[in-house]
């Protein structure tokens, strides 16, 4: 270096090829090597000379890689389930969360469209139906059972009276007894969330299947949040898919340890560990719960996740939840949550916020890179609690923050 002063640092600390033999001596002169406790500068130089790098994961890169790997692994169900050959084609898939049920539904629906056929996809949850509709190709019908019922009732002569206490019983009776127009018969019928269907719903949907059509019934007993009995499907071929490819293995292991899996679940995710954090609040302290939820958002943002990567899932239903009735948690944390109202076309109305917030009931069937599972509180860990924990925790693809009461934490620790 011709003029070391131009470098902006002490010229005595600049070494080049001609003075490389002085490297060790300069370091010893500059750093307190003899000190019992070397300072921060000494540690930095040691890490530099030892080629030690301070790295942190890039969530944006991990999200893309995780989605690609999980899709590839879980795609096996969609591939070989559709290679099965029997007639009539009536396939019941009992599959755990993250086993590829959605990919199978997408593959079957898309193949029907490509073949010029008319498919029907029916699930329980409206949010899941809206989510799947964005993934499916144009054509056919993608609905929740209640959307299907509403459309049928309107086509038969008028809008249902949703003010009546027995409105759904009336609609079910109408769908069971009314003649079925040809326009309501489908070549392919796919039922998702079958564990939430009743026998009456089964009969209503399956009467829409053409005689030589294909039918696939997808269900997960571990996600039975409504306590329904398993619907009998006599004569159907049953296929079990017990590997969860989506949830990090640590989450699957925790759920197995606390007894949240009624049927065995195998961890098949490419990610062994999960970024799991617990934030505790005193039982019954709503303000503390909200404060810990805000802290959970900060933790997710600090880990590099964007607001679009984060979903808030409440352990409570929408009516009993505190968070799901708020427009915001703070000035910077606004919420996008269902208001409980619908427009004239039957579309659900959402608050115009930046962070998605749903109940564990409505978010079933979907997932996000980072999940904040909040308002977790229970006096006794019964089967419903275990199923809600299973559903909520398996929504997370990379990071999971549990916001739970102190009494809920004690019961979890007792089981682990």
Residue spans of the language-model regions?
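Short glycine-rich substrate-engagement loop in P-loop NTPases that contacts/grips substrate
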Residues: 156-176
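Conserved helicase motor core of SF1/SF2 NTP-dependent helicases
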Residues: 63, 69-82, 86-157, 168, ...
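Accessory nucleic-acid engagement/destabilization modules that flank
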Residues: 1-50
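Catalytic-core helical/loop segments in enzymes performing group transfer/polymerization on anionic/lipid-linked
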Residues: 43-56, 79, 84
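Phosphate-binding/switch loop-helix module in NTP-utilizing enzymes
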Residues: 177-183
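Non-catalytic propeptide/linker segments at domain boundaries
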Residues: 56-62
